[in-house]
Structures are given as structure tokens and as C-alpha cells.
């Protein structure tokens, strides 16, 4: 039967992509693209190219044999760390390759991703992704995660460029909620705490390693579900990405 989780992820992915794509078109011109981003060693243009690379990861997914055990969401995103240098180099090469028409190339990757998502759905199933077998819903949510995290990276990057207007918020609220809750789910599954997100963007930045870990920041980002409890020290678990 169709998966509600997959349907929700599909809706969030479309909404986040549409919002971010419109924002990039309005805000990121050639001058801004050449500026350094908030991610050390990455330009704004390379971040834009990475959006296409992120969507391409969904486009290349294929079905796997029945009985294949998928990675959990936490296990899947946990593979990012070991490939960080490779991801950065691949992105730089891609940015050079598509320099003449970066948005056209990114659009083609997104179109292929959504076409593959429709082809593989609407039932949730295990698919082979670049880093291992995952549920299609896991893959879709991971793409929402990529777009939300990098939308925030791009917005903060453009804010730093003198004389440049950052425009409206490129993050879709429902997509941010989905991502924040999913990242919290990874932490809760590992530690068993009963926590809830109090500040979605602050939590996103902590969990994604965009903000240095600080217990006061964590206490603003997360709250215990019951007032008799406190927020645990998650210094050994963060960042998740």
C-alpha cells in the first residue's frame, strides 16, 4: 500500500525544491556565485551545484531484491562523514562542468529525481542508493534534509555578501519541521530521551554542525517533554551530520 511517510516526504521535497529554486534564481547571480560561502572551501556557486548533485542521488536509485535489509536514516546519513572530502571534490568538478548553465543543469537533475520518485512509488520499497540500500521514504527525506540544510547555508552566505539582498527565506516551513523532527529522532533513538524541538532552525544548525556545540544553545533548541527532566548533554552525539 502507499506509504504515508513517503507521500509526506514527496510533498515536502517538491515544496522545498520549488521554493529554493525560485530563491536561487532571484538572488544568486554570477557575482554572488563567485563569493565564498559559509562552508569553508566552498563558493556559493559550488553550493548551488551541490543541490543538483543531491537531487541526482535520488535519480540514480534502483530497486533491489526482496528481503534486502535497508539502512536506517541515522545509518545512512552517518555515511556522510567518511566521504566529506570526496563530496567536496566532486561538487567542485561539477560546478566547473556546469558553469555555462548551472541552473539548467540543476533543473535537469531535479526533474530526473522527481521522475524517478514517481516511478519507484507510491509504495515504499527498498532501493539501492549510492551509499547502500534504503527505504525510498528514507531517501526522499534525506533529499529534503539536503535542500533544507543547504538553503540555510545559501541564505547565510548571501547575507555576508556586501550590497546583496538575501530575499525571502528559502526554507519551506513544513520541510524544516520534517527535517528537525527527523534529526531529533536519530538522537532519541540512540539515547532514549523524551525531547521535543523548541527552535527548529537552531536545532538544525546544531545537528548539522553549522553552529558549534554549546549547552546553552542546545537548551534553546530542545526542551524535555516533561518539566521534571532536563536536556541531556549531547556533546558526544552532535553533530549528527
Which functions belong to the PLM regions below?
Residues 1-127:
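Active-site-adjacent scaffolding segments
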Residues 2-9, 34, 63-73, 119-241:
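Structured surface interface patches that mediate subunit assembly and partner/cofactor docking
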